[in-house]
Amino acid sequence: MSDSLWHLYLLRTTSGMLYTGITTDVARRLTQHQAGKGAKALRGKGELALVFHCEAGDRSTALKLEYRVKQLSKQQKEKLVMNQPSSLVSLLDVRTD
């Protein structure tokens, strides 16, 4: 599993909330979320739309990217959705301290 390629994804709920997650299989994970078997934060939120996904490398890098994206403001996340960058590695280069 450590050799697997991980992906970062954003889902939008019917209320407009953006959910960020990581997985090795975006289609499988979306199906799990839609069946109510994914994150508790999405249960009962209605239809989910996959609005962004990109390759994130190995699990360690994916976890770091997920953390960075979750720290972004809603406006910054909306920019990601609008611009659809193929990579988010540049987020790892930004220092917050």
Swiss-Prot record:
Protein name: UPF0213 protein YE0453
The organism's place on the tree of life at top rank: Bacteria
GIY-YIG domain sequence ranges: 4-79
Listed InterPro entries: GIY-YIG_endonuc, GIY-YIG_endonuc_sf, UPF0213_domain, UPF0213_GIY-YIG_endonuc
Organism of provenance: Yersinia enterocolitica serotype O:8 / biotype 1B (strain NCTC 13174 / 8081)
Family of the protein in this entry: Belongs to the UPF0213 family.
One Pfam family linked to the record: GIY-YIG
